[in-house]
Structures are given as C-alpha cells and as structure tokens.
A protein has these predicted regions:
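Alpha-helix-loop-beta-strand connector modules within alpha/beta enzyme cores
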Residues: 1, 39-60, 64, 83, ...
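Alpha-helical structural signal in soluble globular domains
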Residues: 20, 48-52, 75, 79-83, ...
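Catalytic cores of alpha/beta
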Residues: 5-16, 68-79, 108, 112, ...
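Conserved, mostly hydrophobic/aromatic
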Residues: 17, 61, 88, 106, ...
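Short secondary-structure transition/capping segments
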Residues: 7-9, 37-40, 72-73, 100-103, ...
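Glycine-rich phosphate-binding active-site loops on the catalytic face of alpha/beta enzymes
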Residues: 1-4, 20-34, 82-99, 120-124, ...
Length: 163
C-alpha cells in the first residue's frame, strides 16, 4: 500500500496480504499529511494499521525521508513510534535514494526503537559495506543479485568487504 491512498484502502490491501498468507507488509506512511505538518494523521493512521494487523503481519513503515527536513523527519519518526511503528524502510523508489545522513539521524535520535532499513539509490558494493559498518543489517537494493555475485567473486579472490 502506498502513502497517497486512503487509510481504508491501505487497510483493505493489508487484509488482502494477510488472506494470501504473507507474514510481512511494507506500507508507505501518509507522506502528504506529513508534508503538511499533520503528524497527528500519520500517528493515527499508523496506530490503526498496527492495531489491526500487528498480530498477523510484520509491518514495515516506508518513509520517503529525503522529502523532509531533519526536524520534519524526527517529527515523522515520533509520529510513527507513537502509532506503534517499529520498523522503517527509508527512501525506497521514487528516485530518492537513501543517504547515510538521514539514516544516521534516525539512528541517533531513535536508537534501537526502530529497525532501520536503507533502501533506494544503493548502487555500489562499497555503499553496502558502509551501511554494514554503520550497523545496518538489512539493505534493500535493486542490485541485490549483482552485489551477491560481486561479493562471491571478491571472496574467491581472497578479498573482503572493508567494514
């Protein structure tokens, strides 16, 4: 479910996911509300989704972090946490690309309160190594399979990721 959809539509999509036996669902926050400073809406919608589906799904709240200033991103994180969120996927798609700065800010402010997944714009194995060095354990990229192959070749040649 994407953030521009109504809450009702996102809940229906999540119900569909549960009925088809998935155990995980990524849901984009209502970023138009967040961009308007309506963090109360982000919080209430997150609460509705997590209350309804946390027992059946591992919910990953998607945050297009690059759209927000640092202050706004912190407010978004607070709203998601207050709404029951615990796992954030940062900047997937939309050509936004994750940045070390955004993820470091979220990690610094929220500590272990969230599982944080960088996503989007991760195009080089050295970027993966840097995220791993910074403590991130799940990294999303369209280049996952090429990274695996590149890492396999690196290991065969006796090399390793510099983390």
């Amino acid at each position: 479910p994407i953030g521009g959809q109504t809450l009702k539509k996102r809940l229906c999509d999540m119900d569909y996911v549960v009925k088809h036996r998935s155990d995980q669902c990524c849901v984009t926050i209502n970023y138009p509300a967040a961009l308007s400073g309506r963090y109360d809406i982000v919080e209430s919608e997150c609460r509705a989704m997590h209350t309804e589906f946390d027992a059946a799904l591992h919910i990953i709240d998607i945050v297009p972090a690059t759209l927000f200033s640092a202050k706004e991103l912190i407010a978004v994180g607070q709203a998601i946490a207050a709404g029951g969120g615990y796992h954030l996927k940062v900047n997937p798609g939309y050509g936004l690309g994750s940045t070390f700065e955004e993820l470091s800010l979220l990690k610094r402010v929220f500590g272990e309160q969230f599982i944080l997944d960088p996503s989007g714009g991760i195009r080089e194995l050295k970027d993966v190594a840097e995220y791993v060095r910074r403590g991130f354990t799940v990294i999303h990229s369209q280049k996952t399979f090429p990274f695996i192959e590149e890492f396999r070749i690196l290991k065969e040649r006796g090399g390793h990721l510099n983390v």
